[in-house]
């Protein structure tokens, strides 16, 4: 292991070195015969994690940040952690964290701002203590700022604690510093890949490359195009399309690594730590042009300097503040552009010349930096191993995914230890929208990195395959847990305002769950899902509409049929509902979701319009009564308010009516309109009699006077002189010169004679189509013909 930079008590592991500044890489004599896994650097202390899980520390110990009583440059083991197998360590300015293989988190050091998460603000804690509030969580990843901490749990929950002077906890303005871990709800549902803390700012990275920043922004270190602090996570939109896979934070600057090996930096640049050949701050992410010809696989930020590793050449590039030797260039001056760290470096896959002294060369495995210090894990040329690639995400470190491997592991655990703790651990994952949202990413040509309001970025086929496997009887225990999780936790807790489009994939995933198609679960799964979708705010609701527009017709049709079946089920069982309000809310949810799907289908034509028809409507619902209720509601009548106000009328959703139901509805409408017209005429006649103006009385019938030898012309003439209201009245026909009273027979004869003339090919109004054997209006007719009064009748 090599190291360089500044140590107030001397370089770690070298007792004779009392000089604080080490300006070029030197071998760190610490535990030469044991393998170091990870190094974390604080303000003036260092933490070393060994492959066997032991933890060693050295440096200043003014606040107990070393976890033992000794102070100096010789690393000493933390005895209090000897019984734990530690897998990850992190440092703040004067405090430290250690994560065990069981997901438990320990803290020690300075605690005056609550940064230890121990529910106290003790000035110093010299012995590592378990953070009790996170004991029910399986923590996968931690990161420390100067005086605050971030932690990511297996179920996607994200916790912060410590100082909140600039909003770095992401909890909002109303929250002061926190002495115990607090859940950041504003990122719920997003499958997080990484959390990273700077001096007083914080970042979270999603599996699909969405970057969220908050906290101090005095130099633009959040990349949000301004210098205003943020108290809640904000999406760094300028990085959305860059496929970001890793983030490293300095005290007031930030560096991000993309999947293609590019590096973007932003924030404070007063020492050149952004690598843009200037000392200016940057409020927007800007690519480091000097590194564009190289594929970077590792980045690390110190307080005011930045490192980048290029495996093809084996070189480490450094830029920024060099006053304390932290760049490793052999000088103590600032550097504005990436410059190679001094030393003999070689690529793991490269070949050295025959004359080269192979024992001098180092092969980099991993770089670490923090404060004013840098450490490099490396090996000799002869027995080197490939360097760690930060672009390849380690599944053990990010939000848990639900796939064949995890299901097999759960099945084994439940068979061996079917206790409350095991079940709770499984339920936590299954109840997490974040875990589901990250589980079926479309990885073909990195499609999930394109996730947007128009592209969901998931592979629904893999979702379907997994659910089909779970329906196998051998997975009955897991299936039961999924069902319980969906019913009691996941669906009821879905947010009406998801923080990002990545949090919305769950709305496409859940309909693939086969038990939603089972009528036994309509009330507990299918209808609650519809309610959750309908609760969505305007913008996320539009996003879901866009995604539905993109799905395959088979998926869309299955969704339509699901809620058609739910409507039929509810109508068949409406009498069994003890509380009518519940029935009304359930069927309204199903109908409104169908309406939402219908509107989407109008734009994209996934299915034919008759796919929304529910043929059972005619037999399950009194169409005439339903239409009357709808009519009264539309008219705003005050009659029977308790019934009308809460009643659900299917006529509000005419797209579900087939021809039979629509015919009945139109007949009811015609009869109703006719009765309204007759009543109106009768009421006016009564008024005229009372005002002694009987001559102005109106007939309650529409009376047509026609001649048999000019039937069509007379009918059109008569219709043209009547108002729309008159046209809704019952019809009576009088043939000129005939004394017969029209009791219905004359009207029938009138229509028979009229249609006979209209359908005559010589007349030319209709055309007969041989293929369908149907009649329709002739193409030669102008649009004016269809607007004649006769057409309205």
Question: What role is predicted for each listed range?
Answer:
Residues 315, 321, 331-332, 339, ...:
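Blade-level signature of beta-propeller repeat domains, shared across WD40, Kelch, NHL, RCC1
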Residues 387-752, 757-770:
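Long, low-complexity, acidic Ser/Pro/Gly-rich intrinsically disordered regulatory segments
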Residues 2-22, 49, 56, 60-74, ...:
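Short glycine/serine- and acidic-residue-enriched loop/turn motifs that recur at repeat junctions
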Residues 40, 48, 79, 90, ...:
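Conserved beta-strand position repeated across blades of beta-propeller domains
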Residues 21, 35, 42-43, 85, ...:
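Beta-rich catalytic cores
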